[in-house]
Amino acid sequence: MFEERIVLDSAEFNLRHLTDSADDRQRIATFSAGKNALGLERYLKDCSVGHELAGENRTYLVLDAITDELACYFTLRSGLIPVPENSGQGYLSTLSGMELAYFALNENYRRRKTKTTNTRIGFYVFDKFILPIAKHVSRIIGARILFVYALPHPKLMSYYANTLGFRTLPRELEKFLYDRVKPDSDEGCVFMFQPL
């Protein structure tokens, strides 16, 4: 038997599901992802609740445990990744996974917080919240990978690879995947993954 719920709060941050509290509307309204991540900000403010209610994904808010400020958010959803079989007959197989669909820091919070602490917020949230949820869900439903469609910015891709442990596919497999399942909203992004 498995635990239906896992508790992931820490001394520094509390995790809350997007629709848990009406108070979160004000927190979301003041969220700023910064000038290079306006799409992530717009998603949280304009689309996340609708997608949540439609059952398309789950969005989580990460709140500072002391000040209750919104530090960041992330969105997870399940997915299947097509992979070619080696039979040479054009058959496809699939690999089950979880997509880290959205992940953004509140830039206002980050600027203030990094002046007073050495905590790397993104890594901390990934390590203490995102990975444990993905692994928990994997044990329940059988997901094999955690994947992301990363913007093709060298600094961001390096962060995903060197800090968070994601890998890229060989170019021909990336093209294969792109031709079949990459969403239009991820146009130009690079598929990255890690085993669960």
What are these regions (language model features)?
Residues 1-116, 124, 128, 132-147, ...:
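Non-catalytic substrate-recognition and accessory regions of acyl/acetyltransferase enzymes
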Residues 149-153:
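Short loop/turn motifs enriched for small/polar and acidic residues
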